[in-house]
């Protein structure tokens, strides 16, 4: 009884390992929102304080007319009103993030109030998490409209990152269509964070702009290309010297060249590379997993079920029309077999074997009585013969050998 209670006791901390991004993303968004406020205040302070001091000194020294002083004050008031509007917008964004964080914390706290895996509340909580994982997978796959509709129907809009992934997919799509403007704007907004990134997204985007200028073949624009390289590429000379030297060599090769690496630089596949690079950089900055959370959850379960017989040459039920069994193994299913292919085998501390094991000539082991009963049920096996239920091979009963387990 004690062992049964232990096996069904819920360990909330282990369950929450998969849900770390649930709180990381709002935290990162709140941090970025605060940085935006800080930058706005610093920028306006650097303008207003010197302007106010200058206007006051000019008024005391009678070096400008009252109208000029009023005009200077009006300009400062206008700047401060603009700052107020921006601050109000950022405050609303902060409130939205805080409300989102509150609901996510409440969702995770519910798990700590569930004592057992057998509790009906755990089934309800798990259903919500499954909905979250499915929506996360849909968003990463580009099905943003369907994901949004599902989130609204399930009432979990605050538990999924709709806006984050929608923006990510929009920019990634623009890159696949050959447009760098949105991606560069995103880089400018996250310039400080990108300095710590292990990816060189902004350099690759500027390099692509350089390539597109040269691709025109207009030698008159080569001067523009060199000016672009001097302004945007040379700052990376210490870390990207090889790429910059190749970019310089690109001036001597037409767009239909067959010489590498210039052929690959002109290739349209670079746009797909840039799109994938942006997604990796975006996920890194927001502490998002590079793989869908649904895949991570499935991988853990698949590894617990996988056995050496999975993914063997005999796993497909269609491979042998004489097979008497249909595979219901999730590891071998069409939908999951590729995901499970590189998963490790399950570790079983206990083994369960028949009490009369025998081995067939093909090396497969079965319980003798169970094998004989199954061969009789098939009906197409001659007397004195047995059929391997996995491979469909037929052997003489005399070929069965007893197996002894030490």
Curated annotation (Swiss-Prot):
The LisH domain, residue ranges: 126-158
GO annotation (BP), single: proteasome-mediated ubiquitin-dependent protein catabolic process
Keywords: Cytoplasm, Metal-binding, Nucleus, Zinc, Zinc-finger
Mapped zinc finger ranges (RING-Gid-type): 329-391
InterPro entries per the UniProt record, alphabetical: CRA_dom, CTLH/CRA, CTLH_C, Fyv10_fam, LisH, ZF_RING_GID
Function: Involved in the proteasome-dependent degradation of fructose-1,6-bisphosphatase.
Protein name according to UniProt: Protein fyv10
Species whose genome carries this gene: Aspergillus clavatus (strain ATCC 1007 / CBS 513.65 / DSM 816 / NCTC 3887 / NRRL 1 / QM 1276 / 107)
Organism lineage: Eukaryota, Fungi, Dikarya, Ascomycota, Pezizomycotina
Encoding gene, per UniProt annotation: fyv10
């Amino acid at each position: 009884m004690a062992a049964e209670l232990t096996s069904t006791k819920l360990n909330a901390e282990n369950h929450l390992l998969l849900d770390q991004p649930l709180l990381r993303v709002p935290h990162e968004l709140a941090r970025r929102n605060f940085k935006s406020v800080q930058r706005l205040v610093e920028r306006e302070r650097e303008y207003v304080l010197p302007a106010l001091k200058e206007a006051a000194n000019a008024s005391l020294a009678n070096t400008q007319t009252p109208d000029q002083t009023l005009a200077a004050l009006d300009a400062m008031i206008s700047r401060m009103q603009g700052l107020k509007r921006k601050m109000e917008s950022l405050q609303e964004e902060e409130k939205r993030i805080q409300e989102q964080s509150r609901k996510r914390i409440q969702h995770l706290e519910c798990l700590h109030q569930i004592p057992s895996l057998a509790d009906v509340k755990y089934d309800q909580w798990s259903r919500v998490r499954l909905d979250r994982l499915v929506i996360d997978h849909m968003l990463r796959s580009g099905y943003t409209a369907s994901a949004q509709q599902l989130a609204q129907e399930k009432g979990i809009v605050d538990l999924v990152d709709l806006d984050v992934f929608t923006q990510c997919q929009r920019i990634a799509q623009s890159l696949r269509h050959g447009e760098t403007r949105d991606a560069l704007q995103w880089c400018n907004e996250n310039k400080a964070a990108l300095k710590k990134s292990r990816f060189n997204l902004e350099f690759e985007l500027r390099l692509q702009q350089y390539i597109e200028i040269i691709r025109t073949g207009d030698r008159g624009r080569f001067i523009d290309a060199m000016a672009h390289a001097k302004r945007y590429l040379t700052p990376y000379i210490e870390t990207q010297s090889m790429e910059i030297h190749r970019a310089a060599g690109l001036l001597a090769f037409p767009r239909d060249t067959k010489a590498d690496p210039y052929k690959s630089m002109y290739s349209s596949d670079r746009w797909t590379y840039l799109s994938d690079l942006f997604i990796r950089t975006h996920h890194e900055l927001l502490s998002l997993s590079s793989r869908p959370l649904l895949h991570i959850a499935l991988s853990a379960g698949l590894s617990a079920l996988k056995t050496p017989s999975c993914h063997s040459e005999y796993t497909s039920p269609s491979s042998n029309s004489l097979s008497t069994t249909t595979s219901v193994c999730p590891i071998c299913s069409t939908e999951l077999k590729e995901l499970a292919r590189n998963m490790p085998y399950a570790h079983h501390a206990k083994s369960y074997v028949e009490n009369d094991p025998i081995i067939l000539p093909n090396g497969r082991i079965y319980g003798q009585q169970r094998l004989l009963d199954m061969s009789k049920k098939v009906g197409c096996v001659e007397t004195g013969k047995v059929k391997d239920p996995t491979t469909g091979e037929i052997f003489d009963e005399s070929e069965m050998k007893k197996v002894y387990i030490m």
